[in-house]
Swiss-Prot record:
Binds 4 Ca(2+) ions per subunit. The lineage of its organism: Bacteria, Bacillati, Bacillota, Bacilli, Bacillales. Keywords: Calcium, Hydrolase, Metal-binding, Metalloprotease, Protease, Secreted, Signal, Zinc, Zymogen. InterPro entries: FTP_domain, PepSY, Peptidase_M4, Peptidase_M4/M1_CTD_sf, Peptidase_M4_C_domain, Peptidase_M4_domain, Zinc_Metalloprotease_M4. This is Thermolysin. Its EC number is 3.4.24.27. GO terms for cellular component: extracellular region.
Length: 551
């Protein structure tokens, strides 16, 4: 946890031909109903909504392919859409939409961060979200072929990490596999490797390196500590029971346990289980599955485990009961947490497969699992990783952080646990009354921007992911609670509708490279889907983003 530029930069933790000819049947596309948000870098659409295209007897994905090819000049996209856009996900939702997610490729190679989503209802394409990288077919840099191997790329990344980050060779954890991609930065396109370096010592990190596959140049690097990947979980075979214990703040709560000689913090009632471990002040994870002799967890040493276990369950319940989502991956992944990590450690994070909580040093933090919004914030990073996949850098990273703050707060209200619009207030600076890490109602209170004109444009904090999240946090607060901000009045619509709108935006409209403007369009479209285009909900979303200067 660090203070920089008088701002709290706190990380909790989070780019040939058709095999079969496509026949363009008669269609109607009402151009006058199209609403377009433009990507300023490429001058191409990043969000289009309206009655875009209807072709009788055509599959939803074929509608997308036809629309993109029909508008090739608008997208500056002259490749075969069916060959280039790889369908990764397709499902029907409870509003009657068919939702699809596509990965852009170039000659079969995925383009880093280039994902688009599409919606079809009653045979009509209604929305296309995400930026297609234009003119890749003209890039001579993509025609030479790779010259480096995966191992050579990883060696380059590891050498730089030791020299400039860790100063010693870390003990690497299992990370994501190295991936061969097309990487685009401005007008430059490169064949590249994405190398993931995940480690716990000397300080936890989950670095992503983009290495040029031709000359070995480091094209980009950033720490994405909150990215999630399920890990293997060994469960105890026993009898489900209910224990009782006291949390970090002294409150008593019942917790689900499993009995097999001892009582273990293993909750079998939710998905594939919730497991809480004791790291015993070490940095080896996960540690030992927490065991107790009498199912009574009242010792002070027990308190962080009680809260980590209980609040993971509350967060699971929120996503299931409110959004019909089963765990962070939507498929009931087991949730693992380790407490008593290291000594005096002032942080909490996902290491890529589980939650990790430090005990704090007693001055900056007390045990971080004592904050329900902290727990839900971190688990929401995992939800984001399995849906929008927001890249943890610049505006997409700030959206990533804001989404975690928003749902961390909504879970706190769901649990009715002294809820407020502050982040981390229960565990931060115990000696300072009323202090918190960030404020959603008043980001400027802690030096964070509350308007796009005040955004941070430097390189610290991965391009301001924790700083600029304040802009989106303020918009979310206004959508829920209403108010007047910079002369713009917003009618509040309440927390429940805020949650529904942002959950739909996150899971169906946002893409890895989404910026604030695309988020606005995604939120407006989500409100339109849920409540209708002329509703107060849509008006309030527009008002809130106007109030924080996001167009």
């Amino acid at each position: 946890m660090k203070r920089k530029m008088k701002m709290k930069l706190v990380r909790f933790g989070l780019a040939a031909g058709l095999a079969a000819q496509v026949f363009f049947l008669p269609y109607n596309a009402l151009a006058s109903t199209e609403h377009v948000t433009w990507n300023q870098q490429f001058q191409t659409p990043q969000f289009i909504s309206g009655d875009l295209l209807k072709v009788n007897g055509t599959s939803p994905e074929e509608l997308v392919y036809q629309y993109v090819e029909k508008n090739e000049n608008k997208f500056k996209f002259h490749e075969n859409a069916k060959d280039t856009l790889q369908l990764k996900e397709k499902k029907n939702d409870n509003l009657g939409f068919t939702f699809m997610r596509f990965q852009q490729t170039y000659k079969g190679i995925p383009v880093f961060g280039a994902v688009v989503t599409a919606h079809v209802k009653d045979g009509t394409l209604t929305a296309l979200s995400g930026t297609l990288i234009p003119n890749l077919d003209t890039k001579g840099s993509l025609k030479s072929g790779k010259k480096l191997s995966e191992k050579q790329a990883r060696d380059i990344a590891e050498k730089d990490l030791v020299a400039n980050v860790t100063k010693e060779v870390p003990e690497y954890e299992q990370g994501k596999d190295t991936e061969f991609v097309v990487y685009v930065n401005g007008d430059e396109a490169s064949l590249a490797y994405v190398v993931n370096l995940n480690f716990l010592t000397p300080e936890p990190g989950n670095w992503l390196y983009i290495i040029d596959a031709v000359d070995g140049k480091i094209l980009n690097k950033f720490n994405q500590l909150d990215a999630a990947k399920p890990g293997d979980v060994k469960s105890i075979t026993g009898t489900s029971t209910v224990g009782v214990g006291r949390g970090v703040l002294g409150d008593q709560k019942n917790i689900n346990t499993t009995y097999s000689t001892y009582y273990y913090l293993q909750d079998n009632t939710r998905g594939n289980g919730i497991f809480t471990y004791d790291a015993k002040y070490r940095t080896t994870l996960p540690g030992s599955l927490w065991a107790d002799a009498d199912n009574q967890f009242f010792a002070s040493y027990d308190a962080p485990a009680v809260d980590a276990h209980y609040y993971a369950g509350v967060t699971y319940d929120y996503y299931k009961n409110v959004h019909n989502r089963l765990s962070y991956d939507g498929n009931n992944a087991a949730i693992r947490s380790s407490v008593h990590y290291s000594q005096g450690y002032n942080n909490a994070f996902w290491n890529g497969s589980q939650m990790v909580y430090g005990d704090g040093d007693g001055q900056t933090f007390i045990p971080l699992s004592g904050g329900i919004d902290v727990v839900a914030h971190e688990l929401t990073h995992a939800v984001t990783d399995y849906t929008a996949g927001l890249i943890y850098q610049n505006e997409s990273g700030a959206i990533n952080e804001a989404i975690s703050d928003i749902f961390g707060t909504l879970v706190e209200f769901y649990a009715n646990k002294n809820p407020d619009w502050e982040i981390g207030e229960d565990v931060y600076t115990p000696g300072i009354s009323g202090d918190s890490l960030r404020s959603m109602s008043d980001p400027a209170k802690y030096g964070d921007p509350d308007h796009y004109s005040k955004r941070y444009t430097g390189t610290q904090d991965n391009g301001g992911v924790h700083i600029n999240s304040g802009i989106i946090n303020k918009a979310a607060y206004l959508i829920s609670q209403g108010g007047t901000h910079y002369g713009v009045s917003v009618v509040g619509i309440g927390r429940d509708k805020l949650g529904k709108i942002f959950y739909r935006a996150l899971t169906q409209y946002l893409t890895p490279t989404s910026n604030f403007s695309q988020l606005r369009a995604a939120a407006v479209q989500s409100a339109t889907d849920l409540y209708g285009s002329t509703s107060q909900e849509v008006a309030s979303v527009k008002q809130a983003f106007d109030a924080v200067g996001v167009k």
